Amino acid sequence: MGEVVNLKAATRGGSGSRTRPISKRSAPARTSKRRGSRRDKTALVLGGGGFTGGVYEIGALRALDLLAANRTINQFDVYVGTSAGAFVASLCANGVTPEEMMRVVTHQGPQAFRDIDLGDLLRLNLPELARTGVRLPLRVASLARQLLPQLGQVSLIDILLGLAEVLPSGAYTGQGIERYLRRVLEEDGRHDDFRALEHELYLVATDLDSCERIVFGADGFDDVPISTAVRASGALPMVYAPVKVGDRELIDGGIVSTTNLDIAIEAGADLVIVINPIVPFVNDRSEPGRNGRPARRISDMGFSKIGYQAFKLLGHRRLHELASMWEERYPGVDIVLIEPEPTDALMFETSIMSFSSRIEIARHGFQSVTYHLLDEYERYSEIWARHGIEISERRVRSVVDHFEAEEEQVGAWRKILEGTTGALLRQSGSAG
């Protein structure tokens, strides 16, 4: 976790994928490489990972907010969000703080806006389910006529694939997420319009037919409501139905890249902080499993874990390979990658759509990122100072030490996650 990549070569360009370009207004030419000639441009990039990944990001952002003495996570110049990260990024760009997000997720007041619940996240795709009920018997009869002459040469896979054409395009519609976010962003000075934001916001989806990466917020795609873009960016195949925007059908932006951090570089960022919850699990079977249980093979955890491990491995390897490539390409840009450890069993074993684990995952995100940032404090302090950001080890240590001394640990960690930074510093005696 926390790899720092210093990009050194001279030209800015695309990542090689078919992508709608960022507008020129969002990618100013670099006129000077000398620090201090202007305020450095900063970017926050939030990757995917389902509901679990999004809550992990909120916990990690709470840690970053507490660490930085002269900057908050709502003061980045550029925000890039993919999948679950699109939801969180849209709130960050609208001035919603990590503690406000946590109070909504945990259903604790006072809240900046109403709670989010399972009904918002998982709204069944009833129209397509109903059509399936009507069409499935007809498809079974048609398939039987087609395959009976080939009996003995037909596999179970052939049958399942033959039936798949009449199944829903996704179990859920994603409409609940879009409606919830639209209501939130239309209240209290927030905006559901990319063009009305003070900061640059880019949300990424994938065109199912053309295979293009679609960057909402860039020229030509900045007139789409933010809430619609978030729904499209998080349309995980088979879980959520593709989202129609104009004449396009869009799916999860994480299919192209789990973070799409090159968008931040193209937008002119000098410091890019990436939170990437999607990390493959290094399963050391010589060590006991979580909670002291005997270690298991990943294959013993079911086909979904096998598939998820494979997806994580592909996405994570590509992210780090591209970071190495950019190291030789771009000058003077620092990228900080914040990720779970490869041995993080909790993040791997928890379902990406687990709503009931939200408090545990947020606390885990805060704890793991906080301790890592403290362990690597000198390195991060030097990097962030180059871009005018001051970080304070004393602030974090005093708050964590104060609340860890409390007997009721779940309540203590919730105070950290849900309390304002000012209140935490006053309670721990480190204000000022």
Regions found by a protein language model. Name each.
Residues G2-T82, S90-G432:
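Patatin-like phospholipase
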